[in-house]
């Protein structure tokens, strides 16, 4: 429970800081940027102290304290600036219709693909079968680790993999949070921020409802029609359809015998690849800022 309070503290610090820095932006933009900034603070600030104190509870608390100081400083320096009272300048149905279903889907996929207990066995998804082992190993091995950290499978070898997307889970583990829940919550949150940020970016860039809807659908509900090959022969053999869900590497995403590789952003990239997901959580705000929006 305390781990989720720590997460909430970083998120609140990010929201307070962005609210002070960008008072003229509407409420939805400030909320999205604030939550994104909060995750960035959670990934980076404890790391600074870990080089001296190891990646333990003290480093996490000092990181949270620094985040609070940063937020309070910005709030104090910009206390007299008027805030934009409007929540959003896009039609409210746009983020509801486009983002909410994707977030619900993502939360469900995070649940089914991350150490789901079934009859005493731990189940994962086909797309996370390999990647999750790496991320779990990094998140658990960073507890009280000296910085720069070693790769747990090769002691004495510095960890060269971008691990900040997993270190936020370590922060929560240090304060007693459940491993599975920490991965699911942070993963779903990052996916939600990517969806929301993309919709905001498209709207600010085009101010077109049709363009925003089309771009979002093409970005996240992508992959083409290759999945239709998986339905070939289903009428004659019902097990062929079941194999899509229960067989090992029988999904439509990988059919080398047909020289076909059908890839979807959500199931093949955002769900299994936490480092990419953490990067996109930062990338979308960076692009938004780059265009001066």
Where are these regions (language model features)?
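Active-site lumenal/periplasmic loops and adjacent helix-entry segments of GT-C-fold
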Residues: 102-282
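Hydrophobic faces of alpha-helical transmembrane segments in multi-pass integral membrane proteins
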Residues: 9, 13, 33, 37, ...
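Transmembrane alpha-helical segments
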Residues: 10-18, 44, 194-202, 282-293
């Amino acid at each position: 429970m305390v781990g989720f309070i720590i997460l909430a503290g970083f998120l609140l610090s990010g929201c307070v800081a962005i609210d002070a820095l960008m008072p003229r932006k509407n409420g939805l933009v400030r909320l999205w940027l604030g939550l994104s900034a909060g995750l960035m603070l959670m990934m980076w600030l404890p790391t600074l102290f870990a080089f001296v104190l190891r990646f333990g509870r003290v480093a996490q608390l000092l990181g949270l304290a620094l985040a609070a100081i940063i937020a309070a400083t910005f709030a104090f320096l910009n206390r007299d600036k008027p805030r934009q009272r409007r929540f959003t300048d896009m039609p409210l149905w746009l983020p509801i219709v486009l983002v909410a279903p994707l977030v619900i889907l993502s939360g469900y996929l995070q649940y089914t693909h991350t150490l789901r207990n079934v009859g005493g066995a731990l189940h994962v998804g086909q797309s996370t079968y390999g990647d999750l082992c790496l991320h779990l190993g990094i998140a658990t091995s960073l507890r009280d680790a000296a910085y720069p950290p070693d790769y747990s499978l090769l002691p004495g070898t510095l960890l060269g993999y971008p691990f900040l997307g997993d270190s936020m889970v370590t922060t929560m583990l240090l304060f007693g949070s459940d491993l599975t829940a920490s991965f699911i919550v942070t993963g779903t949150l990052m996916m939600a921020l990517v969806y929301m940020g993309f919709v905001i970016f498209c709207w600010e860039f085009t101010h077109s409802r049709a363009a925003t809807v089309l771009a979002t659908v093409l970005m996240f509900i992508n992959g083409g029609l290759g999945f239709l090959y998986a339905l070939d022969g289903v009428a004659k053999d019902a097990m062929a359809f079941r194999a899509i869900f229960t067989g090992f590497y029988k999904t439509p995403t990988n059919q080398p015998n047909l020289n076909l590789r059908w890839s979807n952003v959500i199931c093949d990239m955002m769900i299994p690849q936490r480092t990419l997901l953490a990067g996109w959580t930062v990338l979308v705000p960076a692009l938004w800022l780059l265009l001066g929006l």
